[in-house]
């Protein structure tokens, strides 16, 4: 909230969800940095927001936000927001599943009116939020894994597609730090957020392949 009250001039990209936040945050930071953008990333991951360097209007703040942090924030107005997924978590704090979902939804409601909302839709709770945001006229990029969708990004068999029937935009197979269905979702969300922040696929795709990953996340332990 104190960070929000400084009214940062740089773009703010906020990422939440039950799982995948840290990987998506660090991946988006890597993509933007590789493209030459000035970036500060942190909040729930690594660097506290009050330790961020000041960035000018050409820079980007990338925030990983837990439901706890969203609860304590009233004035944040991100220009790009991602909700990866929702599954039962922190129910003791939020008084049950409804309270937890409300906390996640609040970040989308706080976002700038013209913000791009990158929304996973692979669980029933996220899918409902995606439908609600579309019905409210918000700018939604839907993310789906393992199935075709007509509007948004989907990943099927490791191939990233922009719409049903289209040619693949990117091949995620063979990226050691982004292996598995869960990381395909993270990669698709980071791709969509980077595009919303003005990058092109030509800038994004090579950065996906050079992403170093996070410690203890799908690291190669040994080779035979």
Protein language model features and the residues they cover:
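Adenine nucleotide phosphate-binding catalytic loops in nucleotide-utilizing enzymes
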Residues: 94-101, 136-224
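Phosphate-binding loop of NTP-binding sites
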Residues: 1-121, 125-138
């Amino acid at each position: 909230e104190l960070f929000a009250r400084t009214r940062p001039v740089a773009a703010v990209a906020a990422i939440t969800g039950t799982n995948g936040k840290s990987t998506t945050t660090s991946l988006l930071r890597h993509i933007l940095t590789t493209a030459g953008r000035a970036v500060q990333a942190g909040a729930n991951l690594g660097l506290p927001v009050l330790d961020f360097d000041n960035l000018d209007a050409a820079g980007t703040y990338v925030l990983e936000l837990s439901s706890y942090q969203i609860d304590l924030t009233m004035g944040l107005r991100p220009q790009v927001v991602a909700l990866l997924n929702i599954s039962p978590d922190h129910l003791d704090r939020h008084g049950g599943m409804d309270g937890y979902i409300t906390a996640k939804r609040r970040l989308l409601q706080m976002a700038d009116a013209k913000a791009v909302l990158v929304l996973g839709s692979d669980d029933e709770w996220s899918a409902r939020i995606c439908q609600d945001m579309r019905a409210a006229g918000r700018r939604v990029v839907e993310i789906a894994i393992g199935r075709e969708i007509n509007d948004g990004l989907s990943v099927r068999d490791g191939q990233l597609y922009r719409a049903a029937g289209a040619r693949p935009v990117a091949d995620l197979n063979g990226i050691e730090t982004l292996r598995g269905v869960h990381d395909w979702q993270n990669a698709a969300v980071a791709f969509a957020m980077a595009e919303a922040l003005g990058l092109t696929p030509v800038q994004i795709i090579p950065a996906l392949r050079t992403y170093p990953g996070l410690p203890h996340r799908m690291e190669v332990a040994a080779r035979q």
